[in-house]
């Protein structure tokens, strides 16, 4: 993490610091006054309900090395210690992160996409970690606050920084890309997330493609070549190498399934390189192909990439498998959802042997298209050989309505507890249960009830 003096910070960003404090060392950054450790820099924000400047005095008393303070904000008479006066604390955080990133000077890999950002980030880290010192975004620290905080967690000897970039509207990824100036930019796919803000999948593709705006000259852009909506934006990328991945044969890296079972999927790249992935889902084959492309660009050997992918582990609640007694498999894919990722989950479940039980919750943030898209997920069940469909949530009722005719058994629930009770009583040996819904639905509670 960042470990510099206030004098160094003063040379990096517009600010004022009393001379007597310039030799004070800073070790780490936090925006949470409850998480202060010795010599941390505390950064307060003015929120709608709470002004973080109220906690500056306590942060300093608790051992903070210094604190940002926004000019024009009344200062408590109890504040005593190193204060860094700035025009705006958020802007100063972002400026500090950009300066520190230049100081550390790692190769930056930026990852965005409607689905699979975190999974792809995890896979890239797995591919690279034996050859480089790698640091990646933790959790969903992928916005205008989280990304700078991630950068400030880099150690001085970090060689690769993998930065996840999220957004809910236009120009947000453009800002993050300009801040981070990636060497490699990645778009995993285009789905329907944030449709209510961006209006259409075309709008989502445009917003995601902003990741190339800050791409360094002679950088690399890796993208889902199976997505037609990205092609117009690829043509706008200048002074960069563009690499398409996907199942279509016109891609630079063509991935094709060799075999799959309850332990994962085996696939081949360009009919030459064979890989074994211990994760379910054809969509994860494409995420892995992106990681392979990154490995190629950074000069890794086939054997290194193969071994590292074979041992990949993902952030929780992404196709996370639990094996219960009597050969029952529960797949926790409940971290988040979109119609696209739900269809991918259905495809994955349909390839497994045993009775296939699908548990789906609402997909949120779809705006006026929500009903139509939930109906579409239900219709997608046709000829997918799903045996049981359980749904929960107001919007998921539309999945039930359109999907019940395509399964042997279906039931919609208004209570999560009721669904859990029915499911537990219904489980049989060799069942395969897949659970998916938007983050706000908290369907991991269903998984926890099954595995506890």
From Swiss-Prot:
Family: Belongs to the MurCDEF family. MurF subfamily.
pH-activity note: Optimum pH is 8.4-9.0.
Gene name linked to the record: murF
One GO term (biological process): cell division
Protein name per the record: UDP-N-acetylmuramoyl-tripeptide--D-alanyl-D-alanine ligase
Role played: Involved in cell wall formation. Catalyzes the final step in the synthesis of UDP-N-acetylmuramoyl-pentapeptide, the precursor of murein. Catalyzes the addition of D-alanyl-D-alanine to UDP-MurNAc-L-alanyl-gamma-D-glutamyl-L-lysine. In vitro, can also use the mesodiaminopimelic acid-containing form of UDP-MurNAc-tripeptide, with the same efficiency, revealing that the discrimination for the amino acid residue at the third position of the peptide in the peptidoglycans is entirely supported by MurE.
InterPro entries: Mur-like_cat_sf, Mur_ligase_C, Mur_ligase_C_dom_sf, Mur_ligase_cen, Mur_ligase_N, MurCDEF_CellWall_CoF430Synth, MurE/MurF_N, UDP-N-AcMur_synth
Pathway named in the protein's UniProt entry: Cell wall biogenesis; peptidoglycan biosynthesis
Main localisation: cytoplasm
């Amino acid at each position: 993490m960042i470990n510099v003096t206030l004098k160094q910070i003063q040379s990096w960003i517009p600010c004022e610091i009393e001379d007597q404090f310039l030799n004070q060392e800073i070790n780490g950054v936090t925006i949470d006054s409850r998480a202060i450790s010795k010599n941390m820099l505390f950064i307060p924000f003015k929120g709608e309900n709470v002004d973080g400047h109220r906690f500056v005095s306590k942060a300093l008393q608790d051992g903070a090395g210094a604190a940002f303070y926004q000019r024009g904000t009344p200062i408590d008479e109890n504040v005593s210690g190193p204060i860094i006066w700035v025009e705006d604390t958020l802007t100063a955080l972002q400026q500090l992160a950009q300066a520190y990133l230049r100081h550390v000077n790692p190769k930056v890999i930026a990852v965005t996409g409607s689905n699979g950002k975190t999974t792809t980030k995890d896979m890239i880290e797995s591919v690279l970690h034996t050859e480089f010192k790698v640091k990646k975004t933790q959790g969903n620290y992928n916005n205008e606050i989280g990304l700078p905080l991630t950068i400030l967690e880099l150690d001085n000897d970090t060689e690769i920084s993998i930065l996840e970039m999220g957004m809910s509207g236009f120009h947000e990824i453009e800002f993050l890309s300009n801040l981070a100036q990636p060497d490699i930019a990645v778009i995993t796919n285009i789905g329907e997330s944030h449709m209510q803000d961006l209006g259409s999948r075309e709008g989502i593709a445009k917003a995601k493609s902003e990741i190339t705006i800050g791409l360094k000259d002679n950088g690399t852009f890796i993208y889902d070549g199976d997505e037609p909506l990205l092609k117009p934006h690829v043509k706008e990328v200048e002074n960069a190498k563009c690499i398409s991945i996907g199942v279509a044969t016109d891609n630079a890296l063509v991935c094709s399934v060799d075999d799959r079972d309850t332990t994962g999927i085996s696939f081949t790249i360009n009919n030459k390189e064979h890989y074994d992935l211990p994760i379910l889902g054809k969509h994860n084959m494409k995420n892995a192909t992106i990681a392979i492309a990154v490995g190629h660009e950074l000069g890794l050997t086939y054997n290194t990439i193969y071994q590292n992918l074979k041992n990949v582990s993902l952030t929780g609640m992404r196709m996370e498998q639990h094996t219960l007694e009597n050969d029952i498999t529960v797949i926790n894919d409940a971290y988040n959802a979109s119609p696209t990722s739900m269809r991918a989950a259905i495809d994955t479940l349909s390839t497994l042997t045993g009775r296939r039980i699908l548990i789906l919750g609402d997909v949120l943030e779809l705006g006026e298209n929500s009903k139509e898209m939930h109906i579409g997920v239900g219709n997608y069940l046709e000829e997918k050989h799903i045996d049981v469909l359980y749904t929960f949530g107001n919007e998921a009722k539309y999945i039930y309505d359109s999907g019940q005719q395509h399964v042997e058994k279906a039931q919609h629930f208004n209570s999560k507890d009721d669904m859990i009770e029915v499911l537990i009583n219904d489980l049989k040996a060799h069942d395969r249960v897949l659970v998916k819904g938007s983050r706000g639905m908290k369907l991991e509670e269903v998984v926890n009830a099954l595995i506890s």
